[in-house]
Amino acid sequence: MSMQDPIADMLTRIRNGQAANKVGVTMPSSKLKVAIAEVLKEEGFINSFTVEGDITNPTLVIILKYYQGKPVVERIDRISCPSLRIYKKRDALPKVMGGMGIAIISTSKGVITDRAARQAGLGGEVICYVA
């Protein structure tokens, strides 16, 4: 049986891994998942990530981050789903928790945060919120 929403699966694995105090989580890899992991690493929500395995079956390994024994990611929510895509113009990009969190946006220039999209004057698909 095929997976309906691989990005929601990725976010759920991160959420469940941190709830269970796991060191890391593994999942099937894709270009979009690697781009999301890169944004999470740049923003300090995960320690690191690697892509392992061969070209035909790559696996994404994400090393989770904790601060004083508590998960750094308090909330991670999928916004745009395959059945209901959510697009925002540059003027309507959301602020997560009053600027304390980030929204990950897929734009024509790649996957970036809401802050970077505002600075570049780009809109796009709102993939998820992370706080």
UniProtKB/Swiss-Prot annotation:
Keywords: Ribonucleoprotein, Ribosomal protein, RNA-binding, rRNA-binding. GO terms for cellular component: ribonucleoprotein complex; ribosome. Gene3D superfamilies: 3.30.1370.30, 3.30.1490.10. It holds the Pfam family Ribosomal_S8. The keyword rRNA-binding applies. GO terms for biological process: translation. InterPro entries: Ribosomal_uS8, Ribosomal_uS8_CS, Ribosomal_uS8_sf. SUPFAM superfamilies: Ribosomal protein S8 (SSF56047). One of its GO terms (molecular function) is rRNA binding. Part of the 30S ribosomal subunit. Contacts proteins S5 and S12. One of the primary rRNA binding proteins, it binds directly to 16S rRNA central domain where it helps coordinate assembly of the platform of the 30S subunit. HAMAP family: Ribosomal_uS8_B (MF_01302_B). Belongs to the universal ribosomal protein uS8 family. This is Small ribosomal subunit protein uS8. It comes from Hamiltonella defensa subsp. Acyrthosiphon pisum (strain 5AT). The gene is rpsH.
